[in-house]
Amino acid sequence: MAEFSPELRKDPISGRWVIISSARAQRPEAPEPRREDETPEARSRCPFCSGREDQTPPEIFTIRNNGELPNSPGWLTRVVPNKFPAFGIFPEINLRRIGMYQMATGYGAHEVAIESPDHDTYLEHQPLNQVARIVDTWWERHVDLERDRKLKYVLIFKNHGKAAGASLTHPHAQIIATTVIPDVLKSKLLNAKDHFVNGEGCIWCRQLDQIYYHENKIYNQDGTILVAIHQRDRVVADNEKFVAYIPFAARMPYEIHIVPKTHQCSFIQTSPEERLELAKMLKVVLMKVYKLLGNPPYNFYIHSAPNLNVMPRMGDYSTIREDFHWHIEILVRTTIWAGFEQGSGIYINPLNPTDAARYLAETEIDSEVVMSDA
């Protein structure tokens, strides 16, 4: 492999800077256990397992076998309020100030989406029809939460492994809806709008266009080609509706984005057919991650447009349906963000994104397993 000099790269969507420093790829890290430690006692008390429905608050949503009673065994996916919520439903939202400081009632929703009754089967190892049920469950809750016009933003996210923040090993995701738009999203929204109003269209659609149809060249001063960059080399997997790739300015070696090929600003705009293709893509990507890296901890989240029921088509959000493009980000925790990253907001990635994409793309998985409903 040719030597790769450290590079500063800027992500055009978030605006953040990343240092790609392949020479640091062998920096020692504390080893992660491949299987989370769990005592038999803790396992026997898991509140998410079938038969322990009385250990959680009453279910909000479920996909279950016909004829089964609510809050009883027989469910396939189950959503319950978080027992220790970050937000709650209150009669009114009380905004107030204390000097220079602002406060507001923590109005919102905090839910747990339990992926299956099976304590030990990760999402990527579930049958395809079960992964499709999981994706449909997220969609149903997202749609329902946006009916509350006080809620401006819905975030669906998953923590896998203790190092990624999971407190329980039973596979699950979480859903939080808030009255504020997070700053991370605001930055993306504003950059997307700037790109759009400058006549360059949707920035995600443009990225996909470059990945599939363009070769970028860097020239020497004498006009000869120094290097030709094929953006498609960062693709991990694709199917009819979605593409998964390592970003140009990835924060971690295995930061993976999954983006719909059709322009949609919100996850709730997806059709049943598109959600099935998303289930296939999630299965493929996470199976590759599992096989290549040995069940590493990871976080993933769906970045969707703010609640379209309440966002006015004016001001900063006047073009949101045209300029924003919903997507999934997966952060595989193979490195640690230490003092420099935390203090500067600049991330050091010890692996060239093209190499990371190649390693994942070349990781073979059984296509029959991906498509199997058994």
Each language-model region and where it sits:
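HIT superfamily nucleotide-processing domains
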Residues: 1-374
